[in-house]
């Protein structure tokens, strides 16, 4: 709901990368191998000398060019300068009309530098988004609704410097009025726990030794119904 279909694409210098929402999967190659976590594309405007402009976030099918190039073209204006790492999924950006600058993580490691410093803006936004999901929502976000949560984060982040709360509220109402109605039961469909019948506790019997009478110990005899 918090995404305007006609919003302007990012321009100027834009950093683009991907991250896992849910943490990296151990044993998978790099940050592109698929697992149970959700791969998310992030694009962030870089403002000189040191600043961050707007951002965009969207779920990706995988880390291939078939997913990454449409993400960039949907969220970054033509003729913008796009900065990425050296992943081969971005190699077609120049053909789409972007000034593409690649920064190699392998070369950074060889120089003893931190690879995260190659794309500082996009990594900062990714860290803020994950912290927001873990703190505000306690990490209780279903994958089916993750894009809606990311849209909310982007809406808040892009208006973090707004001085008019009234205009922000007006924008929320405007977007809500132009969105199709969403019922609560549609949001929670498929997330309800299954109803199961309670299992009665197992009946404990007495030890077999209590069934026989021991001389001098009548209390060890088997219990008989009271006859009055």
Language-model-derived ranges and their functions:
Residues 1-228:
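Residue-level recognition of single "structural anchor" positions
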